From Swiss-Prot:
Belongs to the bacterial ribosomal protein bL9 family. The lineage of its organism: Bacteria, Pseudomonadati, Pseudomonadota, Gammaproteobacteria, Alteromonadales. Binds to the 23S rRNA. It comes from Shewanella pealeana (strain ATCC 700345 / ANG-SQ1). Pfam families: Ribosomal_L9_C, Ribosomal_L9_N. This is Large ribosomal subunit protein bL9.
Length: 150
């Protein structure tokens, strides 16, 4: 099924690209979320009329994401206290949700889906640098300090 993208979508394309996707992906995700329209002549004309508005919205989203990334990078080390054994091994682990909650408590809104932990959850005490992807083009680094609870 051919669709015209109304938003930038990772691993698929940018605004205005006409791409071929599987029918189920289009019907169940792209079309209901408003991220694409079916590629036909009527929709192409409507899209070209709305193109400037959509590009302005995309630029505004990128600017807002850049500001959030600067705020996140400007944060001092975010401290998370967790129960730990004698050798610094945590009882449990610290995952995306815990990091997102700690950053939000520090004053910058962050969703758990934006936190990237490629090596999995954190299981020891210490200092860590966690990558946060606030936009498809914008990344930031959060300094995280995991300490043992007293």
């Amino acid at each position: 099924m051919n669709v015209i993208l109304l938003d930038k979508i990772a691993n698929l394309g940018n605004l205005g690209d006409q791409v071929s996707v599987k029918a189920g992906y289009a019907r169940n995700f792209l079309l209901p979320q408003g991220k694409a329209v079916v590629a036909n002549t009527a929709n192409t004309e409507v899209f070209e009329a709305r193109r400037a508005d959509l590009e302005a919205k995309l630029a505004a989203d990128l600017a807002a994401a850049t500001q959030r990334a600067e705020k996140i990078s400007a944060l001092e080390s975010v401290v998370i206290a967790s129960k730990a054994g004698d050798e610094g091994k945590l009882f449990g682990s610290i995952g995306n949700r815990d990091i997102a909650d700690a950053v939000t408590a520090a004053g910058v809104e962050l969703a758990k889906s934006e936190v990237r932990l490629p090596l999995g959850a954190i299981r020891t005490t210490g200092e860590f640098e966690v990558e946060v992807q606030v936009h498809t083009e914008v990344k930031a680094i959060v300094k995280l300090s995991v300490v043992a609870e007293a």
